[in-house]
């Protein structure tokens, strides 16, 4: 739990560059996609420097260093590729330094961090949109090999996905859609039909 609380301390160096701290002006606007990616990526090394200065234990530093693994700053990477489809891309400018997570706990944090961040960009919070988001984010991490150094099994990953989906539904208060009454005034899903 402590690792989860401290994993993003590096954002304190340049807080305005992270969406959760922005209101109004976006400081990324005048920058290139590569510059923006480098600023965002630097929060990992900035966090490790802070952790060293504060003499935090190695277990906490492991959460800081691995919570993006060797993943990409996807927003800026995808934006660059979409804007400049004919230009070669220097992937190193969009890639976190790693290492990839190597314990169950650091792997779970990586998944939780990515899912939580992506969930804030959903246009609507329905059971379907939340489920699709969680599956898309975590399946992408698995496909990119970001979790291969952890002891997490496929069954573990499926359990984690289901837990995240339920938690996000609770956070965003998704509701079940209630059935309509049919023309004769009876509910199609009434208890009478079930008995």
Give short role names for the model-derived ranges.
Residues 1-127, 131, 140-144:
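Divalent metal-dependent catalytic cores for phosphoryl transfer on phosphate-bearing substrates
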Residues 112, 125, 129-195:
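Long, compositionally biased intrinsically disordered regions
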């Amino acid at each position: 739990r402590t690792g989860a609380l401290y994993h993003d301390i590096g954002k304190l160096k340049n807080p305005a560059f992270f969406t959760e701290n922005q209101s109004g002006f976006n400081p990324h606007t005048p920058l290139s996609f590569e510059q923006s990616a480098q600023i965002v990526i630097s929060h990992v090394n900035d966090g490790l420097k802070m952790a060293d200065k504060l003499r935090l234990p190695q277990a906490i530093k492991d959460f800081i260093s691995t919570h993006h693994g060797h993943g990409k700053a996807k927003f800026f990477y995808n934006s660059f590729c979409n804007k400049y489809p004919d230009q070669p891309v220097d992937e190193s400018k969009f890639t976190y330094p790693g290492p990839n997570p190597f314990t169950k706990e650091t792997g779970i944090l990586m998944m939780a961090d990515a899912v939580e961040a992506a969930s804030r960009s959903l246009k609507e919070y329905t059971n379907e949109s939340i489920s699709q988001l969680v599956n898309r984010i975590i399946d992408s991490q698995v496909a990119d090999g970001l979790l291969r150094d952890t002891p997490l099994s496929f069954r573990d990953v499926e359990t984690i996905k289901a837990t995240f989906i339920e938690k996000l539904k609770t956070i965003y208060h998704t509701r079940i859609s209630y059935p309509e009454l049919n023309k004769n005034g009876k509910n199609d899903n009434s208890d009478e039909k079930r008995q």
